[in-house]
C-alpha cells in the first residue's frame, strides 16, 4: 500500500529570498531623496501695478470708493456661490488689461479649469502680465496640465513646496514626506485672484 505525504496547512516556502527587492526599494528611495532642491534659477522680481486707476477695473473700484455710503474701500466682494465665483473669475480674466495675480492650492484637470486656463493664456497673449503661485502638491499626474502655463510668454509661474526632494519623482516626493513629516502639512491653502 502506497502512503501519501501528510497534508500540511503551511504554505510552501519560496526558493527566492525576498530581501533583495526591499534593498533595491530602499536604495531607490534613498537616492531619490538625495535629489534636494533645484539650483537657483534667475527669477526676475516683479511688483504690483503702480497705477491701477488707469484701467477700467481700477476705475470701477475708484468709483465704488467714491460712491455715497460705500461700505468698502476696495474691490473686494463676497460671492453667493460656486457659479458666481467661477463666472466672476472668468469676467476678471477677460476684463484684465495689465495684470492678473493668481494664487491657488490646487488647479485640477477638469473642464472648468481648462476653460479658465485657456482664458488666462489668452490674456497673456494680449499683453496682460500674469503671475501664478501654485502649491506643488497637486501638480502631478493629470493635474500637471497647469504646468504648461510656465511656457507661455507673459506668464510667471512659481511653485510652493515646503518639502524637499525630487519634484518629478513619486519616490522622491514620498521620501521627502517621510523624512521631514513635520513640513508635509505646511501647504499653501491661500487662494487669491487679482486683476489690474
Task: Please place each PLM-identified region on the residue numbering.
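Sec-dependent bacterial lipoprotein signal peptides
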Residues: 2-32
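A generic signature of intrinsically disordered, low-complexity regions enriched in glycine/proline
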Residues: 14, 40-46, 58, 140, ...
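Bacterial Sec signal peptide processing site at the extreme N-terminus
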Residues: 30-51
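HKD-type phospholipase D/PLD-like phosphodiesterase module
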Residues: 34, 51, 57-58, 64-96, ...
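Phosphate/adenylate-binding glycine loop and adjacent helical scaffold
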Residues: 100
Amino acid at each position: 500500500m502506497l502512503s501519501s505525504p501528510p497534508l500540511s496547512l503551511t504554505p510552501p516556502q519560496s526558493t527566492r529570498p525576498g530581501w533583495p527587492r526591499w534593498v533595491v526599494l530602499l536604495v531607490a528611495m534613498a537616492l531619490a531623496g538625495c535629489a534636494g532642491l533645484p539650483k537657483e534659477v534667475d527669477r526676475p522680481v516683479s511688483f504690483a501695478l503702480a497705477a491701477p486707476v488707469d484701467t477700467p477695473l481700477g476705475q470701477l473700484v475708484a468709483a465704488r470708493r467714491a460712491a455715497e455710503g460705500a461700505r468698502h474701500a476696495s474691490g473686494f466682494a463676497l460671492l453667493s456661490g460656486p457659479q458666481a465665483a467661477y463666472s466672476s473669475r472668468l469676467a476678471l480674466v477677460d476684463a484684465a488689461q495689465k495684470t492678473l495675480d493668481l494664487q491657488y492650492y490646487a488647479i485640477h484637470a477638469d473642464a472648468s479649469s481648462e476653460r479658465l486656463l485657456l482664458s488666462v493664456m489668452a490674456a497673456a497673449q494680449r499683453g496682460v502680465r500674469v503671475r501664478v503661485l501654485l502649491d506643488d502638491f497637486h501638480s502631478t499626474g493629470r493635474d500637471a496640465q497647469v504646468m504648461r502655463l510656465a511656457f507661455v510668454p507673459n506668464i510667471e509661474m512659481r511653485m510652493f513646496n515646503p518639502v524637499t526632494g525630487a519634484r518629478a519623482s513619486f519616490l522622491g516626493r514620498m521620501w521627502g514626506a517621510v523624512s521631514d513629516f513635520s513640513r508635509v502639512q505646511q501647504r499653501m491653502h491661500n487662494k487669491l485672484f487679482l486683476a489690474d
